[in-house]
Amino acid sequence: MHLRSKTVQQLLSVILSVVMVLSMLPMEVLAQETPPVTTPMDLTATTEDTSGDGWSWTQSTKTLTLTGLTLTVSDDSTHALILPDGATIDLADGTASTLTGGSRSTVYSSGEVKLRGSGSLTVYGRGWRSATLDMFIPGTLTVEYDDPDGGAVLKTDEGTEGAAICANVTLDNGILRATGPDFASADDGSSVGLRGRLTTHGSSVEAQLTARTGYASYGLYFDKQGSGRGDTWTMGLGKVTAAAGHALSRYSYGLYVDYSSVNALELDGTQLTAMGGESDQYGSQGVFAGE
């Protein structure tokens, strides 16, 4: 009995030692991290359900569910993520996904894309080449609110030539943060937070549209993406902040309404804050409307 008791004590001592060693390890060593994906994802060519580390695709509903995807591609790739028209990006609760890279755009779609869920998505553009865009969706991006304490969040930074987001955007009780590029020279191009039509629905809407340094600087360049001139457009409930940065050669406008493509812009309950920045040669205004 004495020998058995001694053996048990030795085993307990070993177990305790292992526990103490594990407790001293950093949490990131113990955590199971999702490995990064380095190959561009083109879901327009997919005909069946498929999945990978941090993501899954449901073909019948065209739904991409992100559960902690880290997608990083090189500048040799034109786009990081390509989605079909009518696709939905579902951000799983409590997860954070990051998309990086692409010489022309990080996320591309030929039509409408809907973003929903209570997780977060961060998009970092790469490339900084002529006529490239951080995120280009020439349809409608819809952000749907799911979480009463947060909602889907889209953040863009390190944009390229032009706009962080070039799309007609609909916010339905969601949160949108778009930050344009920061150029050192006027020859590099203009900095725009969001270029396109912005529609807001719901008192929980928050849109933070920020431009930085460039040839010109516009927080929100309000025009119609696509051909033809649009009718009178209305922004509804929600908080919209449009802030311009430093314009090296042209104008710095918080909100610029392009009347060559939009007949008129009306605010229906919108809490709008528009701020112009510094302009080296031309004017700076919070709001400007013209052609």
Regions found by a protein language model. Name each.
Residues 5, 16, 32-35:
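In a subset of proteins, long, contiguous C-terminal domains/tails are tracked
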Residues 32-291:
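A composition-driven surface/loop motif
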Residues 1-8:
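N-terminal secretory signal peptides that target proteins for export/translocation
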Residues 8-19:
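Sec-dependent N-terminal signal peptides
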Residues 21-30:
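C-terminal segment of classical bacterial N-terminal signal peptides
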